[in-house]
Amino acid sequence: MMSHTETSLGAENTRTHNFITQIIDEDLASGKHKSVHTRFPPEPNGYLHIGHAKSICLNFGLAKEYQGLCNLRFDDTNPVKEDVEYVDSIKADVEWLGFKWEGEPRYASDYFDALYGYAAELIKKGLAYVDELSPDEMREYRGTLTEPGKNSPYRDRTIEENLALFEKMKNGEFAEGKASLRAKIDMASPFMVMRDPVIYRIKFASHHQTGDKWCIYPMYDFTHCISDAIERITHSICTLEFQDNRRLYDWVLENISIERPLPHQYEFSRLNLEGTLTSKRKLLKLVNDEIVDGWNDPRMPTISGLRRRGYTPASLREFCRRIGVTKQDNVVEYSALEACIREDLNENAPRAMAVIDPVRVVIENFESEAVLTAPNHPNRPELGERQLPFTKELYIDRADFREEANKQYKRLVLGKEVRLRNAYVIKAERVEKDANGEITTIFCTYDPETLGKNPADGRKVKGVIHWVSAVNNHPAEFRLYDRLFTVPNPGAEDDIESVLNPNSLVIKQGFVEQSLANAEAEKGYQFEREGYFCADSKDSRPEHLVFNLTVSLKEGF
């Protein structure tokens, strides 16, 4: 049964059509595969970002659509950059997005023994050799896009010698950088990836899964295809930058003794989102330099950052559905992402009132205290109502009052009337100012006959503003987030700090209505006339409420 969110956001459960589903349809129809088995294979060297959300939705979505399976596999072949913290965060992100992997999470490191055996098989077939060129020498020998490479002087070692040297590498008898295992393919290939790529290198580093068992680690290109084959993946889907690597993917599998049919790799365009950065290296620098508040800072493009900001799983899934799957690289406008969360929250978020830049209002002819009611959602009666204490002293937003204004200003003006949302019509009679000329109090009168109805004498009151009781409220901190960068493509900048938006976070102190005392972390609210907000999952608590701006009420604000 679909949730209300899924219904409102569109066709999450409808059939998708793209070049990958076309391939799968043909494979199933021809009998090449009887079922579909995909995988999502992140390297645990950072937190997942919005680009990974596209890959997650694609791989898990295909498995769901074709009633198949999808594995979560950690491509953990570089112990220097990886950490169990990233493993845990990736699992949490995938589950939060609404997906469940087949069985237990897999690790490429589960296959280290098998991978070592396949590497030895390539040596025995004369298809791999131990090279002792230094990394600099190897670069020099590799050639360029316009010049062929040169064979290493170690390329023609005997099979016996290579097996013995590979064993020595495994036993820690070479220092780091002094030896590597390379596939023997073609140093004159027009494809750089096929010029005798390194398939094993030495790293004396403890691994988060295997400890100190290994001091040699397989390279991604060697590991990935074999892991797919071991797990019987039918369709190995990755982004376009791995297109040339497919040649190596196929070469490795075709030259080892592994169960057929072999998996095949398909590439789609990665997500390029306007104004965001997805380089893990550059994101890590932002974290390490404390430019942001960790990987889950609400300005970060990470899934955990978007979650903390107030994005919902349904909104991210819908965004990925709308941008689709193609082979063409393009840049998606950030407003397309914002539209998805805005639609979701407009449909599902309860309403509340918050005054972010408060100024005091005193209603001089109101002496008692009333408890009014207001719907939690104008179109969703099943979400119920809330109580609004109405008192002699209130707060309104400073921007909602002027001493003088033209007719276009439909808020409170000295000597004129405005309606308070879900309450009465009030009239501004006079103001009190401090020594600097700043308004400290607006003195008003109210019309007691205007609760839920227009003035009896037929006079028109056009404006409506929000308010909070100055007595029954909760102080709150409001974090008004904006884009982290001032340019559309921050990834192209050498110095990303030079394009940081100095106003990406503005903090205000104000008040929220009483009903938000126990606001649930990450739950979205529409603060009427202000925007969509959620309680911060890290810092908000009942005695110190903190609300993050998720998105404005309308595009362009």
From Swiss-Prot:
<feature type="binding site">
    <location>
        <position position="239"/>
    </location>
    <ligand>
        <name>ATP</name>
    </ligand>
</feature>
<keyword id="KW-0067">ATP-binding</keyword>
<dbReference type="InterPro" id="IPR001412">
    <property type="entry name" value="aa-tRNA-synth_I_CS"/>
</dbReference>
<comment type="similarity">
    <text>Belongs to the class-I aminoacyl-tRNA synthetase family.</text>
</comment>
<dbReference type="InterPro" id="IPR020061">
    <property type="entry name" value="Glu_tRNA_lig_a-bdl"/>
</dbReference>
<dbReference type="InterPro" id="IPR020058">
    <property type="entry name" value="Glu/Gln-tRNA-synth_Ib_cat-dom"/>
</dbReference>
<keyword id="KW-0963">Cytoplasm</keyword>
<keyword id="KW-0030">Aminoacyl-tRNA synthetase</keyword>
<dbReference type="Pfam" id="PF20974">
    <property type="entry name" value="tRNA-synt_1c_C2"/>
</dbReference>
<dbReference type="GO" id="GO:0005829">
    <property type="term" value="C:cytosol"/>
</dbReference>
<dbReference type="InterPro" id="IPR049437">
    <property type="entry name" value="tRNA-synt_1c_C2"/>
</dbReference>
<dbReference type="InterPro" id="IPR000924">
    <property type="entry name" value="Glu/Gln-tRNA-synth"/>
</dbReference>
<feature type="binding site">
    <location>
        <begin position="43"/>
        <end position="45"/>
    </location>
    <ligand>
        <name>ATP</name>
    </ligand>
</feature>
<feature type="binding site">
    <location>
        <position position="75"/>
    </location>
    <ligand>
        <name>L-glutamine</name>
    </ligand>
</feature>
<comment type="subunit">
    <text>Monomer.</text>
</comment>
<dbReference type="InterPro" id="IPR014729">
    <property type="entry name" value="Rossmann-like_a/b/a_fold"/>
</dbReference>
<feature type="short sequence motif" description="'KMSKS' region">
    <location>
        <begin position="277"/>
        <end position="281"/>
    </location>
</feature>
<dbReference type="InterPro" id="IPR022861">
    <property type="entry name" value="Gln_tRNA_ligase_bac"/>
</dbReference>
<dbReference type="InterPro" id="IPR020056">
    <property type="entry name" value="Rbsml_bL25/Gln-tRNA_synth_N"/>
</dbReference>
<dbReference type="InterPro" id="IPR011035">
    <property type="entry name" value="Ribosomal_bL25/Gln-tRNA_synth"/>
</dbReference>
<keyword id="KW-0547">Nucleotide-binding</keyword>
<dbReference type="GO" id="GO:0006425">
    <property type="term" value="P:glutaminyl-tRNA aminoacylation"/>
</dbReference>
<feature type="binding site">
    <location>
        <begin position="270"/>
        <end position="271"/>
    </location>
    <ligand>
        <name>ATP</name>
    </ligand>
</feature>
<dbReference type="InterPro" id="IPR004514">
    <property type="entry name" value="Gln-tRNA-synth"/>
</dbReference>
<protein>
    <recommendedName>
        <fullName>Glutamine--tRNA ligase</fullName>
        <ecNumber>6.1.1.18</ecNumber>
    </recommendedName>
</protein>
<feature type="binding site">
    <location>
        <position position="220"/>
    </location>
    <ligand>
        <name>L-glutamine</name>
    </ligand>
</feature>
<feature type="short sequence motif" description="'HIGH' region">
    <location>
        <begin position="42"/>
        <end position="52"/>
    </location>
</feature>
<feature type="binding site">
    <location>
        <begin position="49"/>
        <end position="55"/>
    </location>
    <ligand>
        <name>ATP</name>
    </ligand>
</feature>
<dbReference type="Pfam" id="PF03950">
    <property type="entry name" value="tRNA-synt_1c_C"/>
</dbReference>
<dbReference type="GO" id="GO:0005524">
    <property type="term" value="F:ATP binding"/>
</dbReference>
<dbReference type="Pfam" id="PF00749">
    <property type="entry name" value="tRNA-synt_1c"/>
</dbReference>
<keyword id="KW-0436">Ligase</keyword>
<keyword id="KW-0648">Protein biosynthesis</keyword>
<dbReference type="GO" id="GO:0006424">
    <property type="term" value="P:glutamyl-tRNA aminoacylation"/>
</dbReference>
<dbReference type="GO" id="GO:0004819">
    <property type="term" value="F:glutamine-tRNA ligase activity"/>
</dbReference>
<dbReference type="InterPro" id="IPR020059">
    <property type="entry name" value="Glu/Gln-tRNA-synth_Ib_codon-bd"/>
</dbReference>
<dbReference type="InterPro" id="IPR050132">
    <property type="entry name" value="Gln/Glu-tRNA_Ligase"/>
</dbReference>
